[in-house]
């Protein structure tokens, strides 16, 4: 039951509006904007907020393409501005080169990605291929389950990214259309609470003609490796910071969506279903039905894909009889989704010996009915008893199209 006092705070708004409102109350200094479906509504709402004078001390920059959008934020962040943008799919791919520059210069840019399939063939619907393709660019990636979490994760990610021990950019990844265009009840972030939770951005190093420094300098073989090492160390420092920030957010706002991971019916689970994003809601509904029959099925939500929470995942599944990983992406050439590959990797040298299988699902926005989730669970139960026969496969292929 939702507390009546809490219910009174809830409003029914579009996901994109809620995210734009969250970005607004984080008090950005520079917003760069280029429209691309299904992200467009986010920057449209921010444009309206700017026109209405609701975002003080902020510059809204209309650019001609996504490469310029991220480039504008690189310059702004380097001089000490809190920056924000939003993109998706081909726009995120166009940013690819500059994503490395952003993270390599240790600029804590924060961006919302309304996850969408990539071309070709052209597809505007949801999967995670766009962000997964950027997993090695040095950005943090936090995947959200619903609109409320998409709102609440933005100030958390700013706080993590802008920590002077970390200084790494980050993406809040929300499922395009499924979350960006849905209308559902949310509590919009309050300005006073957000001001208390998220302090102003105060970087130790900025571009300043009075105190000249170099960003993105030329690095020879004598120094380049140390840059990469320090970047990786910052990511490792982000692991406990993500956990601590989620708990601090709960203390201020009363809401908790998980830290690096989150469990549902997990403590005694014999079969564990792992996933990221909005599909978790469907999975939980199916698991509830299994639990009603007395079957010990649980859900492991992976919230942080970068940095990857190896220790937390190993601990979460150590007592399981079998694990199934659902991926809304495919790493072409491996016949595996990225979360499945990462999960196997972190278990390999651990003391946890549990069979893991994977399914790639929902490509290009294909519907994922509860019957398909139930089928996956039934197959995983067979693995727990008899072992793995097929390690990873596509789900719900239409044979008549092959």
Swiss-Prot record:
Coiled coil start-end: none
GO biological process: response to oxidative stress
Keyword Oxidoreductase: yes
Keyword Protein biosynthesis belongs to the record: no
Domain of life of the source: Archaea
Catalytic activity, reaction form: 2 oxidized [2Fe-2S]-[ferredoxin] + pyruvate + CoA = 2 reduced [2Fe-2S]-[ferredoxin] + acetyl-CoA + CO2 + H(+)
EC nos: 1.2.7.1
Keywords assigned by UniProt, alphabetized: Oxidoreductase
Binding partners and assembly: Heterotetramer of one alpha, one beta, one delta and one gamma chain.
Other facts: It also catalyzes the oxidation of 2-oxobutyrate.
Protein name according to UniProt: Pyruvate synthase subunit PorA
């Amino acid at each position: 039951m939702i507390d009546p006092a809490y219910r009174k705070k809830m409003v029914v708004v579009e996901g994109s509006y809620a995210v734009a409102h969250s970005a607004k109350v984080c008090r950005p200094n520079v917003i760069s904007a280029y429209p691309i479906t299904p992200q467009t509504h986010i920057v449209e709402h921010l444009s309206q907020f700017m026109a209405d004078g609701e975002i003080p001390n902020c510059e809204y920059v209309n650019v001609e393409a996504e490469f310029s959008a991220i480039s504008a934020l690189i310059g702004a962040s380097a001089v000490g501005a809190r920056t924000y943008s939003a993109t998706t799919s081909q726009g995120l791919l166009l940013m690819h080169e500059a994503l490395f520059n952003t993270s390599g210069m240790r600029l804590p840019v924060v961006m919302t990605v309304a996850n969408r399939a990539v071309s070709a063939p052209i597809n505007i619907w949801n999967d995670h291929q766009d962000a997964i393709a950027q997993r090695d660019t040095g950005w943090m990636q936090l995947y959200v389950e619903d609109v409320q979490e998409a709102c609440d994760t933005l100030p958390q990610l700013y706080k993590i990214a802008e920590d002077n021990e970390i200084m790494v950019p980050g993406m809040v990844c929300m499922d395009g259309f499924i979350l960006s265009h849905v209308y559902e009840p949310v509590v919009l972030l309050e300005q006073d609470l957000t001001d208390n939770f998220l302090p102003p951005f105060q970087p130790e190093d900025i571009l300043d003609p009075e105190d000249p420094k170099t960003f993105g300098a030329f690095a020879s073989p004598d120094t380049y490796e140390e840059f990469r090492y320090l970047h990786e160390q910052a990511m490792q420092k982000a692991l406990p910071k993500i956990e601590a920030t989620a708990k601090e957010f709960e203390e201020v706002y009363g809401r908790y969506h998980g830290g690096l991971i989150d469990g549902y019916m997990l403590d005694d689970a014999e079969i564990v279903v792992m996933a990221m994003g909005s599909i978790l809601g469907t999975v939980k509904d199916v698991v509830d039905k299994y639990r009603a029959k007395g079957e010990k099925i649980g859900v492991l939500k992976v919230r942080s894909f970068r940095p990857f929470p190896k220790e937390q995942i190993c601990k979460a599944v150590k007592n399981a009889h079998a694990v199934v990983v659902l991926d809304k992406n495919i790493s072409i050439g491996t016949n595996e989704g990225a979360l499945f590959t990462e999960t196997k990797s972190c278990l390999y040298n651990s003391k946890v010996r549990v069979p893991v299988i994977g399914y790639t699902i929902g490509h290009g926005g294909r519907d994922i009915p509860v019957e398909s989730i139930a089928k996956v669970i039934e197959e995983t139960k067979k693995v727990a008893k008899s072992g793995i026969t097929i390690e990873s496969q596509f789900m719900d292929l239409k044979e008549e199209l092959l």
